[in-house]
Each structure stands twice: as structure tokens, then as C-alpha cells.
């Protein structure tokens, strides 16, 4: 395996510095969910304490897994990341499995982020409904308006265009967006610390509550503790409900290997960049969730009524400035998520095309800009489904993002163990980290796919199981069609 570290003959341009790469990873990690999910999932499922513990544990697991990525990237400094690692270590069939699920892990996040644009505008403009004009229809109970479709489509095309005209230009925009996002969240966090309106007593029930049962009983704040998660089983369920989606929450730090061919710096910096991106991501998730509960004495009622609790809390703390902070922060999160996953998805498809897993068309690199133009165009076209289908329908696919990411983590950890053994250069620490990462990858997959009694809100919903079967079926058809073009060992 000594030839693995040789320079690639890639036609992609080396234009990414460490700050660019951090911004890409962090921008992928933090999207719409960090601002929307405190009210939609985190506070009810896990509360402040359960979410904080789950996010910290999830970050620690991701850091453990990141050591495997840091070891493998210098070995295979090519676009494709986990797909490339798997192909070289375990052959073409395993590589197809890994690549196929990574595609859904990355690409579904682009249209899903685009559907948050309408929610952002709705939350900020109050009763004005500025985007609710023109024809409209509903899919799975989600209303879709022409105005929202037009804005989301324009943003998807613009972000895609920036990716096409040069990775450096896109990376500069990404760096600005990610930096501004951190500033907004940190400012809101400090405001909560110094404000008399944010109180620890407001955070109860700290482990969350049974939202469905409470809503069915028309519960109020006076009797919400009846439905609170209590006891060992309740607390464990609260933590695992959020911990199980850690692969989804942190998916994006692994976008770094996808752009490895475009780094203009030493690969020795990969581990530190990944760790910083994960830590910043953990801070944003935990901070937004904690601030939302601390600032609102009646947050359970607001959660049950479907309010955007992060926005309401920011407004309670800082008035109109708080509203501007959240609006700016979530906009940066959405745009950086779209930008980052465009890059990760297109580089993965570019790599798969080069190995015969996708048609050669996906591997075309623009001679002027040095970017995988056709792969990016494909990502744009697929992502335009977001404004058309709406959040609820896409949500069934997005649930698979965590599965796809977990499969990528599994193969990266396994490839690390195999490569370290073959090359004889892996430390005991690295091997232990890889084994732990391998184990947690399996745990994440089990938690999401297999219903476990007593653990509510952890596994897939019915629609997501159906979408998983559909994606596997499409993969089998595609595999049978493309298999003869695969290159690599059996």
C-alpha cells in the first residue's frame, strides 16, 4: 500500500485553505435543524439536560471517529472520502454500498435545507405572509406556495452556481456564512447568561416530556410534570432519543475528505479541523436548545403549540435585535448547509464516476474553473425537488441521512483497522479509537432501524422504512446496470 500517498493526477484545483475547510465542515454540520429542532424534537424528546448530554456524547463519538478519517485522508488524498477508502480496502461491492448510502446522506440535506427558507421568512415576517402568494397545494399536510418555491429555487441555483465557478469563491462565501453563524449564536448565548429573564427554573422538565400524551390530554404548565420523563428508563430514553440522531446532527464533518484533492495545506491539520468543527457544532446545538428553554417559563406549552421557540426566546431576551440575530443565524446555517453539501455530494459523485460507479458524465471537470460541473448541475436539479415536494415528504428521505452517515463511519473505521494492519504504521491509540468508532457506528444503525421497547422517538417512522426500501431497490437496479463498469479489486 506504499503507493497510496502518491500525488493524485486530479484535474481539480488545490484552492482550499484550513479556514475554508473548517467552514465547509461546520456549515454542513449546522443547518436548519439546530434552530428548528429545539421546538420540534429536542426539548420534548430529551429536555435541556438530555439534549446537552446526548449532544456532548455524540460529539465525543464523532471526534473518536474523526481520528480514523485523519489517518485515512493522507493515505488516499482523493475526492470520494469513505467511498475511496472502502474501495481500496474492501473492494468494489462494498464501495458501492458505502457510496450509495453516502449519496443519500449528503444530497438529501440540500433540498431539506431549502425548504427551511419559507419557514424562516414566515417566522420573521409574522402575519405578513410575504411569500404566500400565487398557486399553492399541500403534500403530506405541508402547504407549498409559489412564492416560497421561487425564493428557494433561486437560492439553490445561486449556491450551485457559486460551486461551479470555483471552489475558492464558494469557500470564501462559506467562511463568511459560518463565521457569522457562530457570532449570532454566541451573542444570543451571552445575552441569556446576563439576562434576568433567562432562569434555570424555566428549564423544567429537564429530561423532556411525552408530547403526544400531553397534547392528547390538553395538558397545561400546571400539570406538565405528569408527562415528564422520569426514572432510569425515562432518562435513558430521553438521552438516547437525541443521541441516536447524532450521525444526522453531525453529518458534514466528514465532508472534509470529499475535498481532499483540493487542499493546499498539509494533511496533518485534518484532525484538528474536524475536531474544531464538531466542537463548534456541539456548542450551537446545545446553546440554542438551552437558551430556548431558559428564556421561556412556559416552553412546554409553546412546543405543543408548534411555535418556533428559539425565535420566541431570542425576542423575549433582546426584542427585535434577538429576532434579527436568529434570522441571520438560521439563514447563514441554511445557506452554508446548502453550499457545503453541494460540495460534498458533487465530489462524491465525481469520484464514483471516475471508478465507473456512475456514468462518465458525472466526472467532467470544467476546464476554466476546475470544478466537477456536471455533478454539481445534477445536484442542483435533484435539489429543486425540495421546493416542489415540501418538508414533510422530504423528511422521510432525510431520516436516511443518519443511516448513510453511520454506514460511512463504519467503513472508515473498518478501513482504518485494515490499513493500519497492512501498513504497520497505526498506533495502539488509533486502533482503539477505530474499534470504538466501529462499535458506535453499529449502535447508531441499530438504534435507528430496530424498535426497542421503552425507547420512544429513536427509530424510523413507517414512511422512512418505506423510503429506505425504495432507496435499496433503486440501488440494486443501478448496481446491476453499472457493475460491469466498476474498477477496483473484487
Predicted regions and their residues:
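Membrane-interface "cap" regions at the ends of multi-pass membrane proteins
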Residues: 1-39, 43-49, 62-67, 78-79, ...
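TM-loop-TM module centered on a large, flexible mid-protein loop between adjacent transmembrane helices
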Residues: 84-86, 91, 123-133, 209-230, ...
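Membrane-helix boundary/coupling elements in multi-pass transport proteins
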Residues: 101-119, 245-263, 285, 320-360, ...
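Hydrophobic alpha-helical segments and their helix-loop junctions in multi-pass secondary transporters
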Residues: 119-126, 179-224, 290-296, 413-423, ...
Amino acid at each position: 500500500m506504499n503507493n497510496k500517498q502518491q500525488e493524485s493526477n486530479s484535474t481539480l484545483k488545490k484552492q482550499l485553505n484550513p479556514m475554508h475547510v473548517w467552514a465547509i465542515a461546520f456549515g454542513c454540520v449546522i443547518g436548519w435543524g439546530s434552530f428548528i429542532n429545539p421546538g420540534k424534537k429536542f426539548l420534548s424528546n430529551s429536555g435541556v439536560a438530555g439534549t446537552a448530554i446526548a449532544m456532548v456524547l455524540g460529539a465525543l463519538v464523532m471526534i473518536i471517529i474523526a481520528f480514523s478519517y485523519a489517518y485515512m485522508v493522507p493515505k488516499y488524498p482523493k475526492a470520494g472520502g469513505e467511498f475511496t477508502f472502502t474501495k481500496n480496502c474492501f473492494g468494489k461491492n462494498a464501495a458501492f454500498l458505502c457510496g450509495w448510502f453516502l449519496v443519500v446522506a449528503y444530497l438529501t440535506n440540500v433540498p431539506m435545507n431549502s425548504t427551511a427558507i419559507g419557514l424562516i421568512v414566515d417566522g420573521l415576517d409574522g402575519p405578513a405572509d410575504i411569500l404566500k402568494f400565487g398557486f399553492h397545494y399541500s403534500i403530506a399536510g405541508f402547504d407549498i406556495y409559489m412564492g416560497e418555491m421561487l425564493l428557494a429555487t433561486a437560492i439553490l441555483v445561486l449556491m450551485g452556481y457559486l460551486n461551479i465557478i470555483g471552489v475558492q469563491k464558494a469557500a470564501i462565501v462559506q467562511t463568511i456564512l459560518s463565521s457569522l453563524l457562530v457570532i449570532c449564536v454566541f451573542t444570543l448565548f451571552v445575552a441569556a447568561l446576563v439576562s434576568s429573564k433567562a432562569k434555570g427554573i424555566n428549564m423544567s422538565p429537564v429530561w423532556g416530556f411525552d408530547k403526544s400524551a400531553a397534547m392528547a390530554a390538553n395538558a397545561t404548565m400546571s400539570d406538565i410534570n405528569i408527562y415528564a420523563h422520569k426514572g432510569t428508563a425515562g432518562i435513558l430514553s430521553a438521552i438516547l432519543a437525541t443521541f441516536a440522531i447524532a450521525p444526522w446532527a453531525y453529518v458534514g464533518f466528514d465532508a472534509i475528505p470529499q475535498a481532499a484533492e483540493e487542499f493546499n495545506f498539509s494533511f496533518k491539520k485534518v484532525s484538528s479541523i474536524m475536531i474544531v468543527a464538531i466542537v463548534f457544532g456541539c456548542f450551537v446545538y446545545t446553546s440554542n436548545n438551552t437558551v430556548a428553554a431558559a428564556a421561556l417559563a412556559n416552553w412546554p406549552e409553546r412546543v405543543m403549540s408548534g411555535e418556533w421557540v428559539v425565535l420566541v426566546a431570542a425576542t423575549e431576551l433582546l426584542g427585535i435585535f434577538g429576532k434579527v440575530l436568529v434570522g441571520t443565524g438560521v439563514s447563514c446555517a441554511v445557506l452554508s448547509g446548502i453550499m457545503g453539501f453541494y460540495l460534498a455530494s458533487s465530489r462524491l459523485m465525481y469520484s464514483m464516476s471516475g471508478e465507473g460507479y456512475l456514468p462518465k458524465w458525472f466526472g467532467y471537470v470544467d476546464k476554466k474553473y476546475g470544478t466537477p460541473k456536471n455533478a454539481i448541475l445534477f445536484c442542483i436539479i435533484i435539489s429543486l425537488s425540495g421546493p416542489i415536494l415540501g418538508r414533510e415528504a422530504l423528511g422521510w428521505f432525510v431520516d436516511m441521512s443518519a443511516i448513510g452517515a453511520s454506514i460511512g463511519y463504519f467503513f472508515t473505521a473498518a478501513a482504518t483497522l485494515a490499513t493500519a494492519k497492512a501498513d504497520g504504521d497505526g498506533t495502539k491509540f488509533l486502533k482503539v479509537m477505530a474499534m470504538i468508532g466501529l462499535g458506535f457506528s453499529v449502535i447508531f444503525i441499530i438504534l435507528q432501524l430496530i424498535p426497542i421497547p421503552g425507547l420512544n422517538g429513536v427509530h424510523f417512522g413507517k414512511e422512512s422504512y418505506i423510503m429506505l426500501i425504495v432507496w435499496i431497490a433503486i440501488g440494486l437496479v443501478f448496481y446491476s446496470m453499472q457493475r460491469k463498469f466498476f474498477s477496483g479489486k473484487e
